[in-house]
Amino acid sequence: MIIVTGGAGFIGSNIVKALNDIGYTDILVVDNLKDGTKFVNLVDLNIADYMDKEDFQVQIMSGEEFGEVEAVFHEGACSSTTEWDGKYMMDNNYQYSKELLHYCLEREIPFLYASSAATYGGRTSDFIESREYEKPLNVYGYSKFLFDEYVRQILPEANSQITGFRYFNVYGPREGHKGSMASVAFHLNTQLNNGESPKLFEGSENFKRDFIYVGDVAAVNLWFWQNGVSGIFNCGTGRAESFQAVADAALAFHKKGSIEYIPFPEKLKGRYQAFTQADLTNLRAAGYDKPFKTVAEGVAEYMAWLNRDA
């Protein structure tokens, strides 16, 4: 069995799909379906069982077994960068992750987990997986950073795989439930389909992010599991492309519309990553040599998926 926490969420459900694509269906999805709309992410996938996150946590804490577990992909977390309830964030992202990590270590189960580029904070260069480059801007980033620091202490003594991935700006299928936290590509598509002018912040040609297609993220996860490589790795393309490039790709697909530029919100000033670009030195040194989709390629594929029933 393979366990995917957050398996009904964005990245988790794409990992389930990638596992299905290589013939795995003995998958336990752990999630919180209080937001019932997330079920759509699993509707076309094959899994063996579903468990609520709180029930799962109780079983982990009591040391109950789940049979023979080949790997745990831990994608379950609060991923809202605008959530400021620190207690909730630390319980959900830090404490729960520690409990699950120790459960896996005791049983020598490979543990692959979601970290985040939010650990780097507001820097504009040197996105390198090392303490001196890390300074998160929000409590979400801090919760991810703190768990990475915890993992760093344990890695030298670990007898089984521990791998963390610092996801950069992920976009693609199965993110519709995320609301305001969904990618710019998702929102632009919605606006275009509603007959509205797609909106970007003023200066969007200067806001550059490392946009990575979710299919590439899932491929990275599976490769590291299949190759047993431990460590903390950036998971981006190594390229910074502008929000304008995302919009251009969306407009090219829809063949209509023009961008409406809106003022940058006061509440995001100083708390907004204006630039991200993954340093892939460690990822490539670990042996991962597959290419990553450009924004033009990935957004075109995503638009086709979003509009497949249109």
Curated annotation (Swiss-Prot):
The protein's annotated pathway: Nucleotide-sugar biosynthesis; ADP-L-glycero-beta-D-manno-heptose biosynthesis; ADP-L-glycero-beta-D-manno-heptose from D-glycero-beta-D-manno-heptose 7-phosphate: step 4/4
Sites where the protein binds substrate: N169, S180, H187, F201, E202, G203, S204, R209, Y272
Principal EC category: isomerase
Gene Ontology terms: biological process: ADP-L-glycero-beta-D-manno-heptose biosynthetic process; carbohydrate metabolic process
UniProt key word Transmembrane helix: no
Cofactor(s), by name: NADP(+)
GO molecular function: ADP-glyceromanno-heptose 6-epimerase activity; NADP binding
Residues involved in NADP(+) binding: 10-11, 31-32, 38, 53, 75-79, 92, 144, 170, 178
CDD domains from the UniProt entry: ADP_GME_SDR_e
Keywords: Carbohydrate metabolism, Isomerase, NADP
Cofactor binding remark: Binds 1 NADP(+) per subunit.
InterPro entries xref list: Epimerase_deHydtase (IPR001509), Heptose_epim (IPR011912), NAD(P)-bd_dom_sf (IPR036291)
Catalytic activity field: ADP-D-glycero-beta-D-manno-heptose = ADP-L-glycero-beta-D-manno-heptose
Catalytic residues in the record: Y140, K178
EC number(s) from the headed UniProt entry: 5.1.3.20
Domain of life, per lineage: Bacteria
Function: Catalyzes the interconversion between ADP-D-glycero-beta-D-manno-heptose and ADP-L-glycero-beta-D-manno-heptose via an epimerization at carbon 6 of the heptose.
Entry comment, domain topic: Contains a large N-terminal NADP-binding domain, and a smaller C-terminal substrate-binding domain.
Family to which this protein belongs: Belongs to the NAD(P)-dependent epimerase/dehydratase family. HldD subfamily.
Subunit details: Homopentamer.
UniProt name for this protein: ADP-L-glycero-D-manno-heptose-6-epimerase
Gene: hldD
